[in-house]
């Protein structure tokens, strides 16, 4: 597709925004979904201080800013900040004029109706896009794995969903949501590191802990066994250098933090773990489709990137499933971006071109048209 008129694909996650052009095989821009505002009054004249910073710039100046995430648990909670992120995406990251490109946005499953309308309204009225579409994240992940039937475990920074899809349609009655994802694991890691005597408290320090989590954490195949190993030897200990040069050592925290995905009770949450929730979702589906779902469990999102997670999932689901059932976990290496990749595939299909909501249709029907045209 010609990038003159290529559609723009934007996957707005709670933690990272992924944006780029339809037809590309990876997003051009990936930056934190953060808006930062200075904590102090600027005193140096001519420094060109801004009243807000977005994405990587907010991240690099985090020491003097208060950082806010406008998307919580996958759902937009602050529209002014969200608009800043979109503005930054179009003009600074992709350097395009939004009025010249169709835009495909992604949304969390079970996104409130009013949110879809607000999204649609901002795109047409603030950014004047010529055409627009909104697609469910988990469905796009399945597309990117080359399937039309499967059950997607999508776990990002803000929310985890289990979405069964049959022949391209999600089965809404069986979609399950867990309000436990990457950000909660980061917070939990902050807590268990403080028990070791390392204190992290500010929004900026949380970002350091997120980095520790991404670099050093893994999922144990057998938690109890791993705890014993950790107690008896220092083989799993790793060191991490903080920005100020101080070096900290991290041991069983490496696998204790991600264990919360399988046992949310350690966070004081009543919900079932990702393994049990996946099983529960399959059991809510028609008995005839279950076999295909068990054989196509697709992982997507950054929080499924922990080493060992697919093996552990395989073990747990196999234990829950009927004994003769073939259980297959698909964990593509690019799963951090599979939602975006699915969007890129969808928006470049010739059959998709008549699916867009055009500016004209929007002007005639208003924001509610999104419910009739986007499934």
Curated annotation (Swiss-Prot):
GO biological process: ascospore wall assembly; chromatin remodeling; DNA repair; DNA-templated transcription; endocytosis; establishment of cell polarity; mitotic actomyosin contractile ring contraction; protein secretion
Residue numbers bearing the N-acetylmethionine modification: 1
Organism of derivation: Saccharomyces cerevisiae (strain ATCC 204508 / S288c)
Reaction(s) catalysed (UniProt annotation): ATP + H2O = ADP + phosphate + H(+)
Linked residues for Glycyl lysine isopeptide (Lys-Gly) (interchain with G-Cter in ubiquitin): 191
Domain of life: Eukaryota
UniProt family annotation: Belongs to the actin family.
Entry keyword annotation includes Hydrolase: yes
Quaternary structure and interacting proteins, as annotated: Polymerization of globular actin (G-actin) leads to a structural filament (F-actin) in the form of a two-stranded helix. Treatments with Lantrunculin A, the microbial peptide Chondramide or the microbial metabolite Chivazole F inhibit actin polymerization. Each actin can bind to 4 others. Interacts with YIH1 (via C-terminus); this interaction occurs in a GCN1-independent manner. Component of the INO80 complex. Component of the SWR1 complex. Component of the NuA4 complex.
UniProt entry keywords in alphabetical sequence: Acetylation, ATP-binding, Cytoplasm, Cytoskeleton, Hydrolase, Isopeptide bond, Nucleotide-binding, Ubl conjugation
Site (Not methylated) residue list: 73
CDD domains in alphabetical order: ASKHA_NBD_actin (cd10224)
A single Gene Ontology CC term: nucleus
Subcellular location field: Cytoplasm, Cytoskeleton
Protein name stated in the entry: Actin
UniProt KW Ion transport keyword: no
EC number: 3.6.4.-
Function text: Actins are highly conserved proteins that are involved in various types of cell motility and are ubiquitously expressed in all eukaryotic cells.
GO MF terms, alphabetically ordered: ATP binding; ATP hydrolysis activity; identical protein binding; structural constituent of cytoskeleton
